[in-house]
Design a protein with these regions (language model features):
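Short, contiguous clusters of charged residues that form electrostatic/catalytic patches at enzyme active sites
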Residues: 31-39, 101-108, 200-202, 226-227, ...
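Soluble catalytic regions of membrane-associated enzymes that act on cell-envelope
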Residues: 69-185
Length: 301
């Protein structure tokens, strides 16, 4: 079980049985994962003489977890998640410019409508490819955010200095940060032998610090895996918040994967006993498919 839950095999181990730790041991975090792994392994391979004492013990620990689990904590009031309906990522200069113009309008509007000192979270790949012109394009917005003491977090595709691409979350304004997915989706983004593959990072442990907060950032596919969240909490100073960003601009009506992914992120937050803030991008409204304007972004805070 550990082989399929941890990288490299864990790179494709979505919907692991270890997700049972969330309802079984809420708030237990890493200990809950270990207890679940122990219980499932014992049920599958253990001799009956060991199961008789083990099952009641695990049931008792689960009861303790439910009795003493704190109420689901609320996210910090300073963090505002804005979901969008931008559709698929831009593939040419014209679509990139139109998308970023509309996104910039929304960012500036949100800056003016939230209290100073806020952190604004936008979805995975909201800004599309981050080029050398992106910093120029966003310069005045970054200055506005900095003057207000705000931090803006945009999902973007970033060129990796070591080759390939990064599925990144870029922060500017009062606090600057760049972090990226530990595990992009296999074959779709992460192609180990591909020259333009998104890079995986299996050796990065601990939280990311954003606007003075220790957070666990889960980018899209990572929300369906156990180990990226576990890696973030393997620290003497674990995160106090899960930030989940995703991009489902490709989704068609009836696709359930976005909801399954959102449920998985919520389960991880329950397991580790921390609040969750999420921002997702969805498909563009069918009626407006021929044009894009600021109102297409449909902010949801």
């Amino acid at each position: 079980m550990a082989l399929t839950a941890l990288p490299p095999l864990g790179a494709i181990g979505m919907a692991s049985p270890l997700f049972a730790a969330a309802p079984a041991f809420p708030g237990f975090g890493l200990a809950g994962i270990l207890l679940t792994a122990t219980g499932l392994t014992a049920l599958a391979t253990g001799p009956r003489r060991l199961l008789l004492p083990a099952v009641p013990l695990l049931a008792l620990l689960s009861l303790v977890a439910h009795v003493y689990a704190p109420a689901r904590p609320r996210p910090p009031a300073q963090i505002h998640a804005i979901s969008t309906r931008l559709g698929r990522s831009p593939t040419d200069l014209s679509s990139w410019l139109n998308r970023n113009l509309a996104l910039r309008t929304l960012v500036r509007h949100t800056l003016h409508s939230t209290p100073s000192g806020s952190t604004l979270l936008f979805p995975e790949d909201a800004a599309g490819p981050w080029t050398r012109w992106s910093s120029v394009f966003w310069r005045t917005t970054a200055a506005l955010a900095r003057a207000r003491g705000d931090t803006v977090l945009l999902g973007a595709t970033l060129a990796d200095p070591h080759g390939g691409l990064l599925d990144a979350l870029i922060g500017f304004g009062a606090h600057r940060v760049v972090t990226s997915a530990r595990q992009p989706i296999p074959l779709g983004s992460w192609i180990p032998a591909g020259r333009r593959s998104y890079r995986a990072d299996w050796s990065r442990f601990g939280p990311t610090t954003i606007a003075g907060r220790r957070v666990a950032v889960l980018v899209c596919y990572e929300q369906l895996l156990i180990w990226p969240a576990a890696w973030a909490f393997l620290s003497p100073h674990p995160p106090g918040l899960i930030i989940a960003v995703s991009n489902h601009g490709w989704a068609t009506p009836g696709i359930r994967e976005p909801q399954i992914q959102a449920n998985a992120a919520t389960a991880l937050a329950r397991l580790f006993g921390v609040p969750e803030v999420s921002a997702a991008n969805g498909p563009r409204p069918i009626a407006d498919a021929g044009s894009r304007k600021a109102s297409d972004l449909h902010p949801e805070q």
